[in-house]
């Protein structure tokens, strides 16, 4: 008997369109598997209302939300649409960024007592905030590019103090980032103190916490991981950016691969570099209690060869140009089998969680 799978995508996020593209790739894989009854749920970008669709398309069709059935969640009872309980067995959230990758949707599904693909609340929340994640990773002795962080309140309380901290702790150039945002949105490189104020205030349009890192000339290496207690780390890949300062949003989604962007899988690394990257990826995955999947990104400094952890993505992209699935495929795990494995990991994780003692015991 087929399981009922809900594929959630869209979301109130700057990464809404990327989520829709990722969902389409997964939807095709689910159709190919022919093992699940698929319930596509689209989250409206403006209102955050959940709607039940018949299918997923690419590019997304103009969705007339006025005629779509709304999805309602009733904790302890079920997920409903058109007054019918959908009896969902597992949820695949493909909502990138805010409310999708930050533990929010994972928390909702935990309250609903429904298995959810990917990391849980804690792993998602920590990984999504680049600043707090780096503070924690320091305690695991993971190498990081020098950084500082601050809240909007502190910045407007004393801008000169913040700029002095940047100058003394990091020097220039630096890279300015919103702490909670993906796909390199809102990120800029400041080469002098004359630019830093503008770029900080630009980043504050996206988040209340800002991360500033020393900018280094580096290779960008990515590493795919899947599994729960027993994990598999795939051969890392490299993103070579030719006409951009770094792998920003335009480079990721506005450029045809092969022109200005080259994907090398596997990345050409020294043996010691490869072993270090896999070791750090393993430590991050285990210490942050990640589950199901993650893509862990690294810098390899061009001058010294030193390795630094960049960031962790608990819901990596699944578009046709996304590295996560490409790295898995290179090592022999085809896309539809990857999707099937991720679903099985969600069931395993759910079963393990239910084994714990509760108040009834």
UniProtKB/Swiss-Prot annotation:
Pathway note: Cell wall biogenesis; peptidoglycan biosynthesis
Subcellular location: Cytoplasm
Residues annotated for Mg(2+) 1 binding in this entry: 297, 311
Cofactor notes: Binds 2 magnesium or manganese ions per subunit.
Source taxon at top rank: Bacteria
Keyword Translocase listed: no
This protein's UniProt keywords: ATP-binding, Cell shape, Cell wall biogenesis/degradation, Cytoplasm, Ligase, Magnesium, Manganese, Metal-binding, Nucleotide-binding, Peptidoglycan synthesis
Entries under InterPro entries matching the protein: ATP-grasp, ATP_grasp_subdomain_1, D-Ala_lig_Van_CS, D_ala_D_ala, Dala_Dala_lig_C, Dala_Dala_lig_N, PreATP-grasp_dom_sf
Cellular compartments per GO CC: cytosol
Principal subcellular localization: cytoplasm
Required cofactor names: Mg(2+); Mn(2+)
UniProt GO molecular function: ATP binding; D-alanine-D-alanine ligase activity; metal ion binding
PANTHER family according to UniProt: D-ALANINE--D-ALANINE LIGASE (PTHR23132), D-ALANINE--D-ALANINE LIGASE A (PTHR23132:SF25)
Family classification: Belongs to the D-alanine--D-alanine ligase family.
Its biological purpose: Cell wall formation.
Protein name: D-alanine--D-alanine ligase
Natural source organism: Borrelia garinii subsp. bavariensis (strain ATCC BAA-2496 / DSM 23469 / PBi) (Borreliella bavariensis)
């Amino acid at each position: 008997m087929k399981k009922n799978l809900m594929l959630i995508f869209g979301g109130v996020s700057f990464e809404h369109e990327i989520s829709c593209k990722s969902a389409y790739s997964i939807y095709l894989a689910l159709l190919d598997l022919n093992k699940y009854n698929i319930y596509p749920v689209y989250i409206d970008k403006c209102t955050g209302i959940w709607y039940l669709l018949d299918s997923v398309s690419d590019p997304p069709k103009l969705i007339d939300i006025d005629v779509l059935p709304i999805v309602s969640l009733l904790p302890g009872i079920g997920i409903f649409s058109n007054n019918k309980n959908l009896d969902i067995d597992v949820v695949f959230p493909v909502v990138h960024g805010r409310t999708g990758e930050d533990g929010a949707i994972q928390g909702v599904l935990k309250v609903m007592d429904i298995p959810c693909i990917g990391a849980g609340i804690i792993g998602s929340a920590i990984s999504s905030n680049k600043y707090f994640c780096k503070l924690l990773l320091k305690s695991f002795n993971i190498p990081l590019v020098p950084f500082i962080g601050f809240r909007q309140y502190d910045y407007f309380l004393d801008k000169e103090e913040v700029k002095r901290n940047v100058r003394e702790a990091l020097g220039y150039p630096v890279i300015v980032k919103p702490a909670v945002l993906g796909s390199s949105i809102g990120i800029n490189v400041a080469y002098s103190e004359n630019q830093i104020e503008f770029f900080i205030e630009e980043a504050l349009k996206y988040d209340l916490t800002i991360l500033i890192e020393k900018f280094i000339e580096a290779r960008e290496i990515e590493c795919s991981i899947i599994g729960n207690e027993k994990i598999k780390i795939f051969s890392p890949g490299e993103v070579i950016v030719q006409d951009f300062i770094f792998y920003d949003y335009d480079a990721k989604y506005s450029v045809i691969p092969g022109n200005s962007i080259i994907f090398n899988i596997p990345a050409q690394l020294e043996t010691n570099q490869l072993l270090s990257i896999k070791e750090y990826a393993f430590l991050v995955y285990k210490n942050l209690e990640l589950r199901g999947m993650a893509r862990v990104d690294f810098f390899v400094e061009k001058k010294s060869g030193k390795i630094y952890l960049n960031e962790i993505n608990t819901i990596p992209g699944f578009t046709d140009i996304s590295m996560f699935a490409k790295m898995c495929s290179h090592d022999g795990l085809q896309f539809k089998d990857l999707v099937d494995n991720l679903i099985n990991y969600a069931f395993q994780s759910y079963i393990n969680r239910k084994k714990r003692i509760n108040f009834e015991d």
